[in-house]
Design a protein with these regions (language model features):
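Structural signature of tandem-repeat unit edges
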Residues: 2-14, 21-39, 51-72, 76-80, ...
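Extracellular beta-strand-rich solenoid/capping regions of secreted or surface-exposed proteins
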Residues: 41-43
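A cross-kingdom feature that marks long, compositionally biased intrinsically disordered regions
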Residues: 284, 288-303, 326-329, 339-341, ...
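Conserved hydrophobic site in ankyrin repeats
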Residues: 318-320, 349
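Charge-dense, extended regions
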Residues: 335-371
């Protein structure tokens, strides 16, 4: 994957990414630029408005793929800005023919048949993978990235600028590279994201924990005539976001929100939260596990809708194996799949019904004629 990256040196000798152009709305950025580790994301880097400094470097980079080795910087000296001998950065190049930037601060156009690169900013980007070594995300870094749905990054974030995710209305998933017990920058990220957010923690063997942080709202009421404002918080998502101990995620504290959440939150929110905890049961003790499982068994209708709406047979088998669904539930799920013209799902669900539940008498058996 080819990228054109504008950047500058940090005081520590790393690279601060300022602006990026690429071939896909789901960029996966390299770890280095010209041998410099990318450690910072600059102010407004992925925002719809460009805020490049007067002087910065520009490099063409071929990013690493699963089949390739380490990322390489384009060797052509005419396409790659080199630092001056005195170490001072070069002036940022003018807009070039191979880049299709947006007008009036809007995101760049999508890559065209001529190989043009799109400006990776604003509404164009949908999923971003930041380099593992990034420690700082600048002010308004993702401002007005309205279609950004998922962000993948390492555990080392220790500085997050003001309103880094302002107007990122579609951002609903974080994939964080971390191992159990590790300090992360998740608390900082959650403090700026108040909408529903599913966080997956991934290590060498894949995802080992998945948590839903529900949406919450804040409001302030003036207490007249002293002009004192009272703070009101609605939603258990706020308490969930406090489940940290010295920047380490505290699963036991997180699990304590569920009883009150059952009073305040919707069935969809509670179902997602409970499923994530029992399917990725990191540090899950028996008492909260029992509460989650009891809730799911009592709300099989949610599971049926989710299986058929998402067409998720893996979830269906998981629910059968954990006895969250009864034989009648699976039959209803198969019926709903048939009504949705999901023939493959209906057949698979009937197979699961036979596999996990004892057959009834011949008169009670279901057949494809029922669907």
């Amino acid at each position: 994957m080819n990228y054109k990256l504008y950047w500058e040196l940090t005081n520590e000798g790393g690279a601060r990414l300022l602006r990026a152009f690429g071939e896909t709305p789901e960029p996966r950025f390299p770890a280095e630029i010209e041998g410099r580790a990318i450690t910072e994301i600059g102010d407004y880097c992925f925002a719809a408005q460009a805020h490049l400094p007067a002087e910065c470097r520009c490099s063409y980079v071929q990013a690493e793929t699963e089949a390739d080795g380490a990322p390489e910087t384009a060797p052509d000296g005419e396409m790659q800005a080199e630092p001056e001998t005195d170490g001072a950065p070069e002036t940022a190049p003018d807009r070039e023919a191979d880049v299709m930037p947006g007008a009036d601060g809007t995101p760049g156009a999508a890559p065209g048949a001529d190989g043009a690169l799109a400006e990776l900013a604003g509404a164009y980007i949908t999923r971003v993978t930041l380099p593992e070594g990034v420690k700082k995300i600048g002010n308004f870094a993702f401002y007005n990235a309205t279609e950004l749905a998922e962000l993948e990054l390492g555990s080392g974030i220790d500085t997050l600028g003001s309103d880094a995710f302002m107007n990122c209305r579609s951002l609903s998933r974080l994939l964080l590279h971390a191992y159990p017990g590790q300090k992360t920058g998740l608390r900082l990220l959650l403090a700026q994201l108040s909408s529903d957010l599913e966080v997956a923690l991934s290590g060498e063997n894949g995802v080992w924990a998945k948590l839903l942080f529900p949406e919450y709202y804040e409001s302030y009421d003036e207490i007249a005539p002293a002009h004192i404002f009272g703070r009101n918080i609605v939603g258990e998502g706020f308490r969930a976001r406090q489940s940290f101990r010295e920047d380490v995620l505290d699963f036991a504290q997180y699990d304590k929100i569920f009883p009150q959440a059952c009073v305040d939150e919707s069935e969809t929110t509670l179902g997602r939260l409970a499923l994530d905890r029992v399917r990725y049961a990191a540090e899950l003790s028996e008492a909260p596990r029992g509460l989650y499982e009891e809730y799911l068994k009592a709300h099989s209708g949610y599971l049926i809708r989710r299986i058929t709406d998402d067409r998720d047979l893996e979830l269906a088998e998981d629910c059968c194996s954990r006895k969250f669904l009864t034989r009648e539930d699976v039959a209803a799920c198969a019926m709903r799949a048939g009504e949705a013209d999901w023939a493959e799902g209906a057949a698979a669900l009937l197979h699961l019904m036979q596999q996990y539940f004892a057959e009834k008498t011949p008169d009670e058996r279901y057949s494809f004629d029922d669907f």
